[in-house]
């Protein structure tokens, strides 16, 4: 392009030097402009810029001129050339603010302001530090800038559309799209080169008007061109394009095309000069548009690249499990196992065709099959094309980095040469050939990044010095160049130096420094080198997995050595060692070999752990996509599949999940304990046992650990994450392509038999091909149906509007029936007159069934009555049609049509030719992305997805071929032309434009060159895919008609085709009248003659003559001569049942499946009609004497005969069998009666009413009937045993989920406890506050003061809080009875079993006595704080006192904060302290179950009896432990069922006792019983054991399973009576949490507890129990139940807390009564 600009610019300069060419009128306008500009000079600086605005580009150019340097990127251009180009650019016509203001004023709309585009290279500030320098060098390496390979490579990775030379990029930094505007003849219409605008044709004007709808005269541009050019030339020095506003009078009537239209519009319409260059260049358009240009390559490089592509693209497996979605291969295989090493040679051939011969993929796939098949199919060739781009990028970056290495090597050599005797500093690391070799061996971008980061670590600080040194040697180099101008190498060096000089003056050292630089400047390099191994040696040890290099031991201890390095930054030896370890860790982490080994190991071993966030716990339910991996533990990344990881990352982005990728197993003990760190640290060890070696080993270990944990692991995890995301996205792109492939592979609809038409009835405009009637409708029943008839060419011939066609034939209203009939008659007339071959009905919703039935019925009547030929009726998916209906293209094509009629047209065209219709949505608006190709398609890079989808179009369009003449005649097919091999949107439209301008058809392929001026490369690529209908041309042309132009035979093989025809007909080629063309025509009529040819011998002969291997091509030619351009697409077939269901419901198997939770609306109750033989089953109620209908259960019939009349009259609806519902997607649902509820439902109408919305779960889907069976039973909806929910991941962390569920439940209970109902109670001590507020209030109150507040237990409870001591408050539960309403105070108040009249009595009789007793203890001489009654503190105090006075028995009393109302009584008679509790009651002090009214009496008795055994502590106490159930509180026991169970027990208890209970309760220990059955049979069981159900072992009833448990006389340890709620939780039996350890995993069997657990003994019947005949177990159990029932009557508000609480037997003992005054459990838990 630069040559083009140069030539154009030179020409334009010559023209503008002639002043005579400037019209006078233009001069006058210019003078006015100059005068007005002078008036506004006060706001401008000396350069004409608005004050405060800086034009960096001008400033930079001026500086460069002063320095005599060309701008960056123009290596060898002289200053004259730079100025030359700047002059050329001076005629750019930018729209300044005045222009935009004027346009806005005239048009009345806001105009998009121009922004800087394409300015990719930023100038460096002179004060830039070396960080900026590093960034610049990284940019140079990784974007390809400054490549010495030639101008073509420069800037290659930057601009996907316009690969421009660096010199142009740099110079045109402020350029915009306006620079590139051309008309469609390729004539530049900007004033960039100051050229005349004399090249506009009527065609250009027409084209612009067609595109933009504008009406303007190009002729006006000619004179204005001079005017603008001169203005720009004169104003260039005074102002930049960012000019200040001027009140200049502009000529609004004459404006150029780029003044009228937005640059973005011009670009999207391909009207820029880049587009023109693409059109005119003889190279396939897609080659020119590739982000990284296609470059020619030598054979050696092709060999190397082919191996690289084979290794990376075809033989290396993906990290995650990605199935091959290459639908062109048979079967689903992994994407690397099918290609053998022979593929490499085929890849090399393909690369040779692409890079050196510029053949596009379809051409290679169709016309060079011998060189790529069978290893490579067309999709593989596209993959080679994509990987070639990656290879080129990698190669370029390697070359850039190699140059940087070489420059650094030269710099180091110069530094060392300056003083050869000076020893190398510790911080200096020579850049040697090993480093260069390592760079040469780099095989991936990751490895290249490793090498570059390694370089920066060691040489980053030297880069500024190197640059400055390079500038210093510039003059010498120039002199050398002058002496030897012909030496190309020296010239290259000089160019490189110039590049560096352009960066600015001498670079300063960085002011910002990282930790490594600080350590380096402190001189810690020396210490770091004494760790024993270099990073390279450690890397080799790691690679070989053994200690290849022994660790060298420095003969001094680390701390001693570190003292020599102490400095201001590191002022202690420990800090020095820390810094040295940091340096070693960083060096190891940057070592490329270490990173390479670790990268491989990390990817092999990496595991994913996932936990939900707080938001995720709430939001991720079973309907959420992240449900199956909400909790994951140690899932190997290798077992990720498809797009799973992308879903994980999306959930993480939404803040739902936290993902952790690590190399070691998490939370696994006993297996896999050894971490990767433990494995590799031995490679940095010295295996000796001296103290010195051990100290160094410790330092090495810490360095390795830091290197892994701080640097390598996070970086590798990030890298791996990006790769996994890329693989998942690639999977999505492939899935989208596969779906589009399946849509495009369908051939046009063909009727079963060609219908012979009556010429009189048919209009000529109908055309050949099949006629289709498209039918479209909307979802509302009141909307009209639109029909559109298209002819064989896809053009709309006629249409019909049927406003009432959606009404039902048997509608209730007569006028609707009549209107429907009228529409049917109209349709009949239309069908009779137009005779379509097929009717295509839009698959909008379930109404499509009804529409199809009505149309079929109508056609059937016409076939019988009017002899209408057979007309097919097909259902067509309308997704594409709806998209087309709403697109801009449909509005442009059918501006006057209503949207539904446009949809009808698209439906008809889709069945006529899917490929053409899908191409309609491939517009610049990217409408094709609106098709539902994949649920996650919007998370893929749009450009990548578009590119892949367009490849599918390219493949299919070239297989089918494109008739260019048809595209001109029928514009709606023009969208196919852009996909022809070698062409594109620009070249395709240009081809059509030339043909339109010449007003001619393409009569043969030769005209592509002669008339359309196509270059040889593009012609070879596209010729075979452009088909010409030679039969239709016939006698209408004088040109030579080549019959092979209508076939897939490529022009390069026409001679062989003729030869085959001549040989097949056995003509004599040497005869004078031999006519190969005639032979061809004869063969086309009798293709079977070709079967006798020996094509293999022909192929051998061709190869011998040097034409190459053409074996497959010859067979293709024979096939083509047998049937020219035979359609290879799959024949059309009607959609199957599943496709119809998905089409009409708009569901997919992923969105609608068995087990899904849905909502539906009840429509009615379904009844089964009564059968005649069932009439005699009427039932008579003996109490009322009335009869009941056996079906509808109506029970008010006085006589049996009335029941029969009820049957006969039809008033009996029948037996209710279920509920009918309707889902949102119009599918009908049915809920059988037994699935309405877990309880028996006789009358469904009592449960649900029509119109009610119910939550259900899908049990069965009938896709044929559009029906689903549903359940709305609570057990099925909750689905605790995962019978219906989607399966969870194999590595799902059920334990973590169970723990979280438990925590959440406890949290909820705490929250529920803190809530209370505000009460209206008039009492000075009453406050509407919660317990926290109460305790805060009491902080400032005196001991014994009272606060009365609402209780969290409910509206019939109050809580009395009194202050026991500082920081200790007791909460007493008060139960109210006889309440008038929820807010008033009850008439009687109860504390446990004691009744009070009012709150004052409670204060006086209950609280104040206790407060007085508490004061007595608080004032006792042996009272001690002990930190709020801390047992440990008490024990320490006793031990200390005993030591001081060994002959005394010390004792102390202390108020207990954990158990308010209790005091610790500690004493130490001998060696071990003992601690007991004294409880405050209103009656006195309770100690060892006795009440003492005074303190003296208490301690007197204590001193006398302290040696007595504590009553109740007997071995029998263990028998009374709580059964192994979380919920085994008395409130959970169903007394009625339990009594029934007890009554059924045998008198003499035997080992079958449990079975007898199980028979009654239905709760046998059947291991096959599912948790769902347990849940339904355990009344009051809330499933607290686990999320997945805990099996039967947690049933409260299992306590009766063991005969040795004497339930009639339960014993109780005194420790229970003293236990307050806070301790009950701690002292409950240990078997609760462990009773069902596996339950959370859904293993439905009884888990046994630990051997120590009493529950395991409880559940084991022992044979000797049967000998206990003296005990009447039935009576005992009955007696126990009666006691329990009496207790329940006393306490009418049972506590429902599912936490462990004391066993039911405890409260029945007489001893526990006194202990009931203790605070409540839930008050203490808060």
UniProtKB/Swiss-Prot annotation:
Name the chain's protein.
Answer: Transcription elongation factor SPT6
Q: Which GO terms describe its molecular function?
A: DNA binding; histone binding; nucleosome binding
Q: Region Disordered: start and end of each range?
A: 1-196, 219-248, 482-512, 1611-1726
Species in which this protein is naturally found: Danio rerio (Zebrafish)
Print the keywords alphabetically.
Answer: Chaperone, Coiled coil, Nucleus, Phosphoprotein, Transcription
- Reply yes or no: does the keyword Transcription apply: yes
Classification of source organism: Eukaryota, Metazoa, Chordata, Craniata, Vertebrata
Q: What is its main location?
A: nucleus
Q: Which GO terms describe its cellular component?
A: transcription elongation factor complex
UniProt lists compositionally biased (Low complexity) regions at: 1628-1640, 1647-1656
Where would you find this protein in the cell?
A: Nucleus
| Basic and acidic residues bias: start-end ranges | 502-512
Q: Which residues form a coiled coil?
A: 806-865
Output compositional bias ranges, type Polar residues.
1611-1627, 1657-1669
Q: Which family does it belong to?
A: Belongs to the SPT6 family.
Composition bias, Basic residues: 110-120
Q: Which domain of life is it from?
A: Eukaryota
Q: Where is the S1 motif domain?
A: 1204-1273
Stretches assigned to the SH2 domain: 1316-1426
Q: Where is the composition biased (Acidic residues)?
A: 1-18, 31-45, 55-79, 93-104, 146-157, 166-186, 219-240, 484-501
């Amino acid at each position: 392009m630069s040559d083009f600009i140069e030539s154009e610019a030179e020409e334009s300069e010559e023209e503008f030097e002639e002043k005579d060419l400037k019209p006078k009128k233009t001069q006058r306008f210019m003078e006015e402009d100059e005068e007005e500009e002078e008036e506004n000079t006060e706001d401008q600086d000396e350069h004409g810029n608005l004050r405060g605005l800086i034009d960096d580009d001008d400033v930079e150019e001026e500086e460069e001129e002063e320095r005599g340097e060309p701008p960056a990127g123009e290596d060898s251009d002289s200053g004259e050339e730079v100025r030359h180009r700047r002059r050329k650019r001076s005629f750019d016509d930018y729209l300044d603010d005045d222009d935009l203001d004027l346009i806005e004023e005239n048009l009345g709309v806001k105009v998009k302001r121009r922004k800087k585009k394409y300015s990719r290279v930023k100038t460096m500030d002179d004060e830039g530090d070396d960080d900026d320098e590093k960034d610049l060098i990284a940019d140079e390496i990784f974007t390809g800038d400054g490549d010495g390979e030639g101008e073509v490579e420069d800037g290659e990775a930057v601009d996907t559309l316009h690969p421009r030379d660096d010199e142009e990029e740099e110079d045109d930094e402020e350029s915009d799209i306006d620079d590139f505007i051309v008309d469609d003849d390729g004539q530049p219409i900007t004033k960039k080169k100051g050229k005349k605008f004399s090249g506009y044709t009527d065609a250009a004007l027409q084209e612009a008007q067609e595109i933009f709808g504008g009406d303007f005269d190009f002729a006006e541009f000619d004179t204005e061109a001079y005017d603008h050019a001169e203005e720009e030339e004169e104003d260039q020095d005074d102002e930049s394009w960012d000019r200040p506003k001027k009140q200049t009078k502009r000529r609004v009537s004459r404006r150029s095309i780029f003044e009228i239209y937005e640059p973005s519009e011009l670009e999207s319409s391909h009207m820029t000069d880049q587009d023109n260059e693409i059109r005119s260049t003889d190279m396939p358009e897609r080659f020119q548009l590739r982000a990284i240009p296609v470059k020619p390559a030598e054979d050696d490089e092709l060999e190397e690249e082919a191996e690289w592509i084979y290794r990376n693209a075809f033989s290396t497996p993906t990290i995650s499990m990605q199935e091959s979605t290459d639908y062109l291969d048979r079967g689903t295989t992994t994407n690397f196992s099918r290609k053998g090493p022979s593929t490499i040679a085929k890849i090399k051939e393909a690369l040779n065709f692409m890079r050196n011969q510029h053949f596009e993929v379809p051409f290679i796939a169709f016309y060079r099959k011998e060189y790529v098949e069978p290893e490579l199919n067309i999709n593989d060739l596209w993959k080679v094309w994509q990987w070639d781009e990656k290879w080129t990028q990698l190669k370029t970056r390697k070359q850039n980095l190699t140059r940087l290495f070489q420059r650094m090597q030269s710099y180091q050599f110069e530094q060392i040469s300056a003083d050869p005797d000076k020893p190398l500093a510790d911080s200096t690391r020579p850049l040697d050939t090993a480093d260069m070799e390592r760079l040469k061996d780099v095989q991936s971008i990751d490895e290249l990044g490793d090498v570059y980061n390694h370089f920066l670590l060691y040489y980053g600080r030297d880069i500024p010095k190197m640059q400055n040194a390079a500038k210093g040697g510039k003059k010498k180099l120039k002199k050398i160049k002058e002496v030897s101008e012909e030496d190309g190498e020296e010239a290259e060096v000089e160019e490189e130096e110039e590049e560096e000089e352009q960066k600015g003056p001498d670079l300063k050292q960085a002011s910002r420094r990282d930790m490594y630089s600080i350590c380096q400047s402190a001189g810690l390099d020396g210490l770091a080198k004494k760790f024993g191994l270099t990073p390279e040696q450690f890397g080799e040890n790691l690679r070989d997995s053994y200690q290849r290099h022994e660790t060298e031991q420095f003969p001094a201890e680390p701390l001693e050595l570190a003292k020599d390095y102490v400095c201001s930054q590191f002022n202690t030896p420990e800090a020095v060692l820390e810094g040295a370890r940091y340096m070693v860790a960083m060096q190891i982490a940057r070592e490329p070999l270490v990173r390479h080994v670790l990268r491989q190991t990390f990817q092999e071993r990496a595991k994913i752990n996932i936990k939900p966030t707080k938001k995720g716990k709430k939001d991720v339910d079973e309907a959420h996509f992240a449900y199956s991996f909400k909790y994951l533990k140690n899932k190997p990344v290798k077992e990720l599949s498809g797009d799973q990881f992308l879903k994980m990352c999306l959930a993480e982005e939404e803040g739902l999940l936290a993902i952790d990728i690590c190399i070691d197993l998490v939370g696994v003990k006993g297996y896999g304990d050894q971490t990767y760190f433990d494995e590799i640290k031995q490679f940095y060890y010295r295996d000796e046992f001296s103290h010195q070696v051990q100290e160094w080993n410790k330092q090495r270990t810490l360095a390795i650990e830091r290197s892994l944990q701080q640097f390598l692991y996070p970086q590798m995890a990030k890298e791996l994450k990006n790769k996994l995301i890329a693989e998942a996205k690639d999977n999505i792109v492939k899935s989208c392509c596969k779906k589009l492939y399946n849509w495009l592979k369908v051939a046009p609809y063909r009727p079963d038999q060609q219908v012979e038409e009556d010429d009189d009835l048919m209009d000529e405009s109908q055309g050949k091909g099949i006629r289709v009637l498209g039918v479209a409708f909307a979802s509302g029943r009141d909307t009209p149906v639109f029909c559109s008839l298209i002819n064989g060419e896809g053009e709309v011939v006629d249409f019909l509007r049927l406003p009432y066609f959606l009404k039902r034939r048997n509608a209730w209203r007569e006028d609707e029936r009549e209107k429907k009939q009228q529409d049917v008659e109209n349709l009949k007339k239309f069908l009779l007159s137009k005779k379509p071959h097929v009717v295509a009905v839009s698959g909008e919703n379930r109404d499509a069934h009804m529409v199809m039935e009505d149309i079929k019925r109508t056609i059937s009547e016409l076939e019988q009555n009017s002899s209408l030929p057979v007309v097919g009726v097909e259902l067509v998916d309308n997704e594409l049609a709806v998209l087309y209906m709403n697109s801009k293209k449909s509005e442009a094509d059918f501006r006057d049509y209503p949207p539904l009629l446009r949809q009808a047209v698209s439906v008809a065209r889709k069945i006529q030719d899917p490929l053409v219709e899908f191409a309609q949505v491939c517009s610049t608006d990217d409408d094709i992305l609106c098709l539902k190709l994949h649920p996650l398609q919007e998370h893929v890079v749009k450009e990548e997805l578009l590119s892949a989808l367009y490849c599918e179009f390219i493949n299919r369009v070239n297989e089918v071929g494109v008739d260019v003449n048809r595209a001109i005649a029928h514009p709606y097919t023009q969208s196919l032309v852009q996909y022809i091999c070698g062409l594109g949107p620009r070249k395709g439209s240009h081809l059509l434009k030339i043909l339109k301008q010449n007003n001619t058809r393409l009569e043969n392929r030769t005209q592509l060159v002669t008339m359309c001026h196509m270059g040889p490369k593009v012609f070879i690529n596209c010729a075979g895919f452009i088909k010409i209908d030679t039969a239709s041309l016939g006698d209408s042309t004088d040109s030579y008609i080549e019959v092979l132009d209508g076939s897939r035979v490529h022009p390069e093989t026409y001679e062989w085709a003729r030869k085959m025809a001549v040989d097949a007909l056995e003509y004599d080629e040497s005869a004078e009248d031999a006519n190969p063309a005639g032979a061809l025509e004869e063969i086309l009529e009798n293709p079977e003659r070709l079967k006798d040819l020996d094509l293999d011998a022909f192929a051998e002969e061709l190869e011998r003559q040097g034409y190459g291997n053409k074996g497959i091509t010859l067979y293709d030619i024979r096939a083509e001569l047998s049937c020219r351009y035979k359609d290879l697409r799959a024949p059309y077939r009607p959609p199957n049942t599943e496709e119809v269901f998905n089409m009409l419901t708009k569901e997919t198997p992923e969105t609608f499946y068995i087990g899904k939770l849905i909502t539906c609306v009840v429509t009615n109750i379904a009844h089964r009609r009564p059968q005649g033989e069932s009439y005699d089953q009427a039932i008579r109620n003996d109490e009322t004497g009335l009869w009941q209908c056996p079906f509808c259960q109506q029970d008010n019939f006085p006589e049996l005969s009335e029941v029969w009349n009820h049957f006969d009259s039809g008033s009996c609806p029948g037996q209710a069998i279920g509920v009918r519902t309707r889902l949102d997607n119009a599918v009908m649902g049915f809920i059988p009666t037994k699935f309405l509820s877990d309880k028996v439902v006789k009358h469904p109408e009592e449960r649900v009413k029509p119109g009610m919305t119910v939550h259900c779960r899908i049990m069965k889907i009938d896709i044929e009937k559009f029906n689903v069976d549903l359940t709305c039973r609570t057990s099925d909806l909750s689905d605790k045993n995962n019978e219906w929910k989607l399966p969870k991941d194999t590595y799902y962390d059920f334990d973590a989920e169970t723990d979280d569920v438990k925590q959440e439940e406890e949290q909820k209970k705490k929250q529920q406890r803190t809530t209370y109902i505000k009460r209206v109670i008039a009492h000075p001590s009453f406050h509407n506050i919660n317990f926290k507020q109460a305790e805060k209030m009491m902080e400032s109150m005196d001991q014994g003061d009272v606060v009365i507040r609402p209780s969290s237990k409910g509206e019939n409870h109050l809580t009395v809080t009194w202050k026991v001591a500082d920081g200790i408050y007791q909460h007493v539960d008060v139960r109210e009875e006889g309440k008038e309403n929820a807010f008033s105070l009850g008439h009687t108040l109860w504390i446990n079993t004691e009744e009070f009249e009012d709150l004052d009595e409670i204060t006086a009789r209950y609280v104040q006595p206790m407060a007085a007793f508490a004061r007595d203890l608080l004032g006792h001489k042996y009272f001690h704080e002990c930190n709020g009654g801390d047992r440990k503190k008490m024990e320490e105090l006793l031990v200390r006192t005993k030591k001081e006075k060994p002959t005394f028995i010390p004792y102390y009393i202390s108020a207990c904060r954990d158990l308010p109302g209790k005091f610790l009584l500690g004493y130490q008679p001998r060696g071990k302290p003992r601690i007991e509790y004294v409880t405050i009651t209103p009656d006195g002090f309770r100690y060892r179950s006795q009440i003492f009214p005074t303190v003296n009496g208490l301690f007197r008795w204590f001193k006398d009896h302290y040696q007595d055994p504590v009553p109740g502590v007997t071995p029998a106490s263990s028998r009374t432990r709580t059964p192994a159930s979380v919920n085994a509180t008395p409130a959970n026991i169903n007394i009625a069922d339990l009594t029934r169970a007890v009554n059924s027990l045998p008198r003499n208890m035997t080992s079958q006792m449990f079975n007898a209970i199980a028979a009654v309760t239905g709760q046998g220990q059947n291991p096959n019983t599912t948790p769902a059955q347990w849940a339904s049979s355990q009344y009051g069981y809330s499933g607290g054991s686990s999320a997945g159900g805990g099996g039967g072992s947690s049933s409260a009833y299992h306590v009766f399973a063991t005969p040795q448990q004497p339930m009639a006389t339960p014993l109780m340890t005194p420790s229970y009576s003293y236990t307050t709620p806070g301790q009950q939780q701690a002292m409950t039996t240990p078997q609760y949490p462990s009773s069902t350890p596996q339950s959370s995993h859904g293993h439905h069997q009884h888990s046994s507890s630990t051997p120590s657990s009493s529950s395991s003994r409880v559940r084991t019947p022992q044979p000797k129990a049967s000998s206990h005949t003296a005990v009447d177990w039935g009576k005992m159990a009955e007696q126990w139940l009666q006691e329990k029932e009496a207790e329940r009557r006393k306490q009418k508000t049972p506590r429902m807390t599912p936490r462990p609480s004391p066993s039911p037997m405890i409260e029945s003992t007489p001893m526990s009564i006194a202990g009931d005054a203790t605070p409540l459990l839930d008050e203490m838990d808060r």
